[in-house]
Amino acid sequence: YDSQPGQRLEIHDSYARWFTGWLPLWNMGVMTVIDYGDEMERLYYRRPQGSLRGYKSHQVLTGEELYRHPGLTDLTCDVNFTDLLELSRNCLGDTVTLMTQRDYLLPYAENTPQDAFLTDEHGAGGHFHVLIQERL
């Protein structure tokens, strides 16, 4: 991804420290990460200030507003799945898969309003991604 000068990108160092610290203890199994975000190119394409935002009283806060109510604002950002993919592939090789929540759930979905909400490609189904990491 070719970022622009002055563009803000979120880096998930805490995940990298946790994953690499825990990896020697993980002998076998599947780890699944489900969160909102995307791969770097799609995530930051129209977000020169990054995805960091806050929520206070059901209002979205960005920019300097994030810092006006310390302790009263929930801060969040989208997961940059490119970082997680690269880390996982470097540690585990080809046993890593990334897909949308929609693609992950469709084989199990029933014709209900709840499943329609979870698999809507323009809603939760497209905004949430699933990273499956296997150690065989």
Label for each model-derived stretch:
Residues Y1-L136:
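Long, Lys/Arg- and hydrophobic-enriched amphipathic alpha-helices
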